[in-house]
Amino acid sequence: MAPSVEGAGVALEVVERGSGPSVLLVHGIASDAQALAPIAETLSAHARAIAYDRRGYGGSGAPEPYQGTTVEEQAEDAAALLRALDAAPALVCGDGFGALIALDLCKRHRALVSSAVLSNPPLFMFVPEATEQLAAQRAEIEEAVRAGGPQAGVDAWLGGRVEGEALERAKAAHRAFFADYAGLASWPASRRELRALDVPAVVLTGPWSPPHVVAAAEALAELLPAARRATDGDLAAAAQRLIDRD
């Protein structure tokens, strides 16, 4: 069993590799620390790579009943973890929902963050054209839940992107998935606040990123004063460039 640290009221299972500057890897919806293991392994050659299961996923705890969360609550978990591990300031790499958590750390816990990789950030408040895609996605998930239960809803959201053991882990964590999904739009941030975030950052998408996610990434990169865009989808490479920069 991996060691755990206390988050904001829940125990979080943590996996560490390597030594050097701290890198915190924050997974997205329907994922876990195991999914980030290849990235952590790559980064551990030159850094202290820290991955953890967010609340409700993998070996981490969650309140009972676990029916909802917010970006800010998740960021409090991450902040508590960084303090408990004496790992700040850290390069924070967040994917999907994890990118919003990284942004909130930059906004409210600036001293804990040295730089950030924001991969596929679902910051759709600045992308009006995303409304149609998000509505269709919600309808598909709801139909899947009616037909096959909550695990089928997770499967529908993943849309074949994940298979095998990773898919089974995601479906087993369906409570955390739906808590996350409900919290996607929970982050209160204005253009003015984002323009004030001076954290060196890479806003990352890949060739496979959906158009509305790419649009969100473009909008975010234009607002963050110290951000640059990358479109190769290589989170480890983006993180390594920031490590080398420091």
What are the residue ranges of the model-derived segments?
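Conserved acidic catalytic loop of the alpha/beta-hydrolase fold
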Residues: 72-90
